[in-house]
Amino acid sequence: MSKLSKRQEEILAYIKDEVKKKGYPPSVREIGEAVGLASSSTVHGHLARLEKKGYIRRDPTKPRAIEVLSLGFDNDTFVKKETASFIPVIGKVTAGVPITAVENVEDYLPLPDHLAAYDNTYALVIQGESMIEAGIYDGDQVIVRQQQTADNGDIIVAMTEDNEATVKRFFREKDYIRLQPENSSMEPIILENCTILGKVIGVFRTIH
């Protein structure tokens, strides 16, 4: 077994701890913050050496794709995890009054492969309470499949005529489009037209 430096031991221990606690590995930034390394290139260098020594395996095409191999675990603690895919979290969108859409990638959300089966899937953080009767609450992350069409009753992410994004239930009426909140105290948004950015296919919530 190749000997590890103290820093490599710290990094490997942190990765193992995060995988055990969360079920997925930390990002390069998180690793750097945990062990006191400000340079991401330095972290990448240590990860490359851990990989060369057989402790981890990385997929350079995917974010956070660090797999701790059996060599990196004690025999009595090694448990094979279901592989996960990481979809981008591209900002916040309101479930109340429409707000301007944010399309910068802020983070990556791990999902089991069977839930992230589409390349054009992303996540948005919900702000507001207009969808609470559909089980979508303030602070939830909705999983969105990018598409440009929707059926009546679908929950969608819509871009309004004022270039503002909102999550609502979609209804195409005879002469207008109705974006219906799932909150009986709120009124629908009535539009002549809107751009459908995607369909909500799931909700991710962290229980504190």
From Swiss-Prot:
Gene3D superfamilies linked: Umud Fragment, subunit A, Winged helix-like DNA-binding domain superfamily/Winged helix DNA-binding domain
Broadest EC class assigned to this enzyme: hydrolase
Active site: S130 (for autocatalytic cleavage activity), K168 (for autocatalytic cleavage activity)
Site (Cleavage): A95, G96
Family recorded in the similarity comment: Belongs to the peptidase S24 family.
Subunit structure: Homodimer.
Protein name: LexA repressor
Provenance organism: Shouchella clausii (strain KSM-K16)
